[in-house]
């Protein structure tokens, strides 16, 4: 059954996509602890496809995510059903956006995914050494060569987005956005304002607060030992009472809709405007189905306002990522 769609460039994609970071294997486990076998992970991808959740997000950095999706595409022959996004540029030594590396990472992603064209190719983080005009110029060459359809940026500054867009249209901005994280709305950051002005779609990653807005976690002790959420300052034990209070209030709003706190959260983000798309990830089919079910939840204006008030007043301290230094940064100026 198809989900409602929204635009990226001139393409229509499911308004609720699938983020594949959580399902990826990285070494012996994954970003969020234990990872299932390929067969079990294929079942999750099968369920996403069957539910009409056909905008899939991956990254060069996400362990075996690209390979897993590539195997699924080969196994099913359903390449034409999936709008495929991936990201490049993060290395163990830092971020790279030099032209040779852009081309190298695209070639690797095409091979891993087993496709001849990537629908949406993002720079994962801004390279603090390479002017963004040079990076996007190299990305634009990939469009000319037919290897990429649309270009995107992730966690850039408003100025970097504007400079990039002047070189080649930027179709999407991937950014963390949820009731916990409203950074892009800050007038000093001006990222939402700039994206709207330029017609850039907002793809919200971690829309469920990395799972904490679902109510599934009652304390950091609920995270598996190797779960990277243990490193996030915002999710400290001291903050959990505030986090759980937000969840309780979302649950109360959801009762009128027979909806979970997570569904209310996704519905609220989608209610921010037609330029918003969400890409929650999960390792389990039951949570995938819950996420997709948010498409049928229509909050009233009063409920949208109530969630906003909750988000603005919750004031949960701490960085949203242990590596905040790489977030929302600008790019060096192009030499004259």
Swiss-Prot record:
EC number(s) reported in the record: 1.1.1.-
Protein residues bound to substrate: 124
Pfam families in the record: Aldo_ket_red
Gene3D superfamilies referenced in this protein's UniProt entry, alphabetically: NADP-dependent oxidoreductase domain
Coiled-coil regions listed in the entry: none
UniProt-annotated catalytic positions: 62
Gene Ontology CC, one term: cytoplasm
Pathway(s) the chain acts in: Mycotoxin biosynthesis
Induction section of the entry: Induced in strobilurin-producing conditions (on CGC medium after 6 days of growth).
Biotechnology: The structure of strobilurin A was used for the development of the major class of beta-methoxyacrylate agricultural fungicides since its beta-methoxyacrylate toxophore targets the Qo site of complex III of the mitochondrial electron transport chain and prevents adenosine triphosphate synthesis. Compounds such as azoxystrobin (Syngenta) and Kresoxim methyl (BASF) are among the most widely used fungicides worldwide. This class of antifungals are used as effective treatments against a broad range of destructive fungal plant pathogens and make significant contributions to food security.
Keywords: NADP, Oxidoreductase
Cleaved signal peptide residues: none
GO terms of molecular function: aldo-keto reductase (NADPH) activity
InterPro entries with a match to the protein in the record: AKR, Aldo-Keto_reductase, NADP_OxRdtase_dom, NADP_OxRdtase_dom_sf
Annotated NADP(+) binding sites: 57, 154-155, 174, 206-220, 283-291
Source organism, top-level taxon: Eukaryota
Chain's role: Aldo-keto reductase; part of the gene cluster that mediates the biosynthesis of strobilurin A, an antifungal polyketide that contains a key beta-methoxyacrylate toxophore that targets the complex III of the mitochondrial electron transport chain. Strobilurin biosynthesis begins with construction of benzoyl CoA by step-wise elimination of ammonia from phenylalanine by the phenylalanine ammonia-lyase str11, oxygenation by str8 and retro-Claisen reaction to form benzoic acid, which is activated to its CoA thiolester benzoyl CoA by the dedicated CoA ligase str10.
Family (UniProt): Belongs to the aldo/keto reductase family. Aldo/keto reductase 2 subfamily.
Protein's name in the database: Aldo-keto reductase str7
């Amino acid at each position: 059954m198809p989900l409602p769609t929204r635009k990226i460039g001139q393409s229509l994609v499911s308004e609720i996509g699938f983020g594949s970071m959580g399902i990826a294997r990285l070494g012996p486990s994954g970003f969020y602890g234990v990872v299932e076998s390929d067969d079990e992970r294929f079942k999750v991808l099968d369920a996403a496809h069957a539910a009409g959740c056909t905008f899939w997000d991956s990254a060069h950095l996400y362990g075996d995510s690209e390979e897993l999706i590539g195997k699924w595409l080969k196994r099913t022959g359903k390449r034409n059903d999936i709008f495929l996004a991936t990201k490049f540029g993060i290395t163990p030594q830092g971020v790279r956006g030099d032209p040779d590396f852009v081309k190298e990472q695209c070639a690797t992603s095409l091979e891993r995914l087993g496709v001849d064209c990537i629908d949406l190719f993002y720079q994962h983080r801004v390279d603090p050494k390479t002017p963004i005009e040079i990076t996007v110029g190299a990305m634009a060459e990939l469009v000319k060569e037919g290897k990429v359809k649309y270009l995107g940026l992730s966690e850039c500054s408003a100025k970097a987005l504007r400079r990039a867009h002047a070189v080649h249209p930027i179709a999407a901005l991937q950014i963390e956005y949820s009731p916990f994280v409203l950074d892009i709305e800050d007038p000093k950051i001006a990222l939402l304002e700039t994206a709207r002005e330029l017609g850039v779609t907002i793809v919200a990653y971690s829309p469920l607060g990395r799972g904490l807005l679902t109510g599934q976690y009652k304390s950091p002790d609920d995270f598996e030992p190797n779960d990277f959420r243990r490193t996030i300052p915002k999710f400290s034990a001291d903050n959990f009472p505030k986090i759980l209070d937000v969840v309780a209030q979302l649950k109360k709003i959801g009762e009128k809709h027979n909806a979970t706190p997570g569904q209310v959260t996704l519905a609220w983000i989608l209610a921010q405007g037609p330029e918003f798309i969400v890409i929650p990830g999960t390792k389990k089919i039951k949570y995938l189905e819950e996420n997709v079910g948010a498409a049928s939840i229509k909050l009233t204006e009063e409920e949208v306002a109530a969630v906003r008030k909750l988000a603005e007043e919750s004031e949960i301290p701490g960085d949203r990522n242990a590596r905040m230094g790489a977030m929302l940064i600008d790019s060096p100026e192009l030499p004259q």
